[in-house]
Amino acid sequence: MAFDPASLTFDANGLIPAVAQDHATGEVLMMAWMNAEAVARTVETGCVTYWSRSRQAFWVKGETSGHVQRLIELRIDCDRDCLLLLIEQEGPACHTNRRSCFYTALREGEERIILDPMV
């Protein structure tokens, strides 16, 4: 069956959450938003494209930083309202220069930084 981004369930703002996961290690790297056009561009080019809610513009991951995300596989959840992007990550995924945006853990009621910025 051919894929049509319009078959996905978008929120009231026309967006769908997308979780980026390293295809080789399974590490969750980040979560961002996509609209139908960002999904289509990602599938078409193989370069992950998100929708920036703050800038109201497309955001090709790594276009300016060089920290590119290459799409290996796109998975759709059972309700078609969330995407899992299995990717190959070049450099850090987070704008804080960390491998993952999920670098703060709650341990024994305290927030702990568990990942240092990459050099």
From Swiss-Prot:
Its EC number is 3.5.4.19. It comes from Cereibacter sphaeroides (strain ATCC 17023 / DSM 158 / JCM 6121 / CCUG 31486 / LMG 2827 / NBRC 12203 / NCIMB 8253 / ATH 2.4.1.) (Rhodobacter sphaeroides). This is Phosphoribosyl-AMP cyclohydrolase. Pathway: Amino-acid biosynthesis; L-histidine biosynthesis; L-histidine from 5-phospho-alpha-D-ribose 1-diphosphate: step 3/9. Binds 1 Mg(2+) ion per subunit. Binds 1 zinc ion per subunit. Gene3D superfamilies: Phosphoribosyl-AMP cyclohydrolase. InterPro entries: PRA-CH, PRib_AMP_CycHydrolase_dom, PRib_AMP_CycHydrolase_sf. Disulfide bonds: none annotated. NCBIfam families: PRK00051.1. It catalyses: 1-(5-phospho-beta-D-ribosyl)-5'-AMP + H2O = 1-(5-phospho-beta-D-ribosyl)-5-[(5-phospho-beta-D-ribosylamino)methylideneamino]imidazole-4-carboxamide. It comes from the Bacteria. PANTHER family: HISTIDINE BIOSYNTHESIS BIFUNCTIONAL PROTEIN (PTHR42945), HISTIDINE BIOSYNTHESIS BIFUNCTIONAL PROTEIN HIS7 (PTHR42945:SF1).
